[in-house]
Amino acid sequence: EEGSLILLDGRDNIKRKNSENGYFIGPTLIDKVKSSMKSYENEIFGPVLQIIEVNSMDEALKIINENKFGNGCCIFTSSGEKARKFSQNVNIGMVGVNIPLPVPSSFHSFGGWKDSLFGDLNMYGPDGLRFFTQRKTVTQKWPEESSESKGINLSMPNNLN
């Protein structure tokens, strides 16, 4: 309705018990999203990825940091300098660099900042001791220097090497 473009509709071909009332959605990819749209202003929990194109790093940081939520976001780049700047300046609890999800591993706490922080989901392991700190998790994946860029690789890391 607001002008975004659904590239992959998670409502298609859903055949699950109790899903007819909207309790389940498959992977959904939304392009041409603007920061003024309802889908961006509200935090969507589910396999939904929204794409906002920006003209600069500063514009990206401004859009993200002005949102009242702060759960997770991703950046795809071949520049370590840009990845560091983004990771250090974005007010988000979970940051992904060159991976489609910010926290792909169970040994990290799951939790955001701002209005995305809820309950005690950051309270396991050593994080229980860090309860009164504001934590940021940055998960990164970089291609080998000799490999040529073949576009964005959306595969998850499969080892810790």
Predicted features along the sequence, with ranges:
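Long, low-complexity segments enriched in small/aliphatic residues
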Residues: E1-L5
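Cytochrome P450 fold signature focused on the C-terminal beta-domain
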Residues: L7-K17
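Conserved C-terminal structural/oligomerization subdomain of aldehyde/semialdehyde dehydrogenase
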Residues: K17-N161
